[in-house]
Amino acid sequence: MNHSKKVLNVFSLVMINVIAVDSLRTLPISAKLGFSLVFYYIFAALTFFIPVALVAAELATAYPNTGGIYVWVREAFGRRAGFITIWLQWIYNVVWYPTMLAFIAATLSYLIAPHLGNNKFYLLGTALTLFWVFTFLNCFGMKLSSIVSIIGASIGTLLPMIVIIVLGAVWIFQDRPVAVNYPTTWLPDFSSLGNLSLFSAVLFGLIGMEMSAVHAEEVKNPQRDYPKALFYSALLIISTLSLGSLAIVIVVPNDSLSVVSGLVDAYAIFFNSYNMPWMTSVIAVLIILGGLSGVSAWIIGPTKGLLVSARDGSLPALFSRVNKYGSPVAILLTQGVIFTVLSTVFILLDSINAAYWVLSDLSAQMALLVYIMMFAAAIKLRYSKPEQPRGYTIPGGNLVMSLISGIGIICCIAAMIVGFIPPSQIPIKNVFLFECFLIGGLILFVFIPWLFAKKHDEQLCSEE
């Protein structure tokens, strides 16, 4: 191990984690939980967020190769399992894109005509336009630098996050009126499973720590500093997401809270009350710039793992090719077609909130499957490849690793189960269409990679 490359201190790793995980898009949907969101975030941190970070740190330092989860699962369970995992990681991002672009479109509407934020045709048209523009730019190798993306994430995510937390704190200290139709309890209502459905959205809002885990080996003293950085990261991320969501809770009535435009609605209420309505537009511009600076990376990023898998032979040869700009055009265009079809859910379902939730839920379901595979791989590799050098190792031996990974697996399965139940907080009139879209999408997107992987294995056997 080259110690000259160990350049990250605890603070650096904490900031990498915060930028990777913190998201404004999560705040409105978390706010739907009312004050009980604090319980959800603390519970999610203990049963999912921290286990993911610990397990990913060990795996990333044991297998620092490019490929991440794909490599980890492949080493544990073989190429077919690795391909299914990287496919799911790609497709859940594709399903997630419409929600993120709808969020940007709703924020953009505040600069044009605020009422458009509740117009499903405007959201659909804007999301499709933005996605295809950035897809074609990526096809020609036109990307923003990582520095620009980091700056955009900072001013477009962290700054607005801090602003809404400060506004919420000032509002409370000034004893201003608080929205009262939220549950006043800090504990969830366990009387109905529908009240727990949004837990999968809370978990989905906390994904991303495995991407920053690749930096664990660059920490000066991994065994000492990585757990310390993890503790501070978890504290900061859970605090910012909880407090940001609570700021929305105290000013936007639950019945009128949009999970798409709810964040900007909250800013508008705050700034209008302080006779600073122009500040809503300033914040909206920051959010849009931050979002757009990341769109290019979101579109091209997940295709890289799929390209590696395609070159392994797990997909038709067409998907393993790149153009003269180094862009996987076939994957990008396929991604665009799937995005376009999925985006029509904004028209098919009865409300924007319902459409936004079903896409978020389907994304979360597939993401949780990926994490189940990651946890299972961590346990398997401890027993099958104990001799593999690890820059960071979860202390306590195989028993503690199995316990931590087991808690993560149980948490993911529980969240998936309640995710199939329509949430009490988001009325869904056409429950049949909701269930068909969710179950059908899950079956389709899991069956396709299994089919490709099975066909590839059969070809290998026939060649041998």
Curated annotation (Swiss-Prot):
Pfam hit, one: AA_permease_2
GO cellular component, one term: plasma membrane
Gene3D superfamilies: Amino acid/polyamine transporter I
Keywords from the named record: Cell membrane, Membrane, Transmembrane, Transmembrane helix, Transport
Principal location listed in the UniProt entry: membrane
An MF annotation (GO) of this entry: transmembrane transporter activity
Transmembrane stretches, start-end: 7-27, 37-57, 94-114, 121-141, 153-173, 196-216, 231-251, 282-302, 329-349, 359-379, 401-421, 432-452
Protein family membership: Belongs to the amino acid-polyamine-organocation (APC) superfamily.
Protein name: Uncharacterized transporter lpg1691
Organism: Legionella pneumophila subsp. pneumophila (strain Philadelphia 1 / ATCC 33152 / DSM 7513)
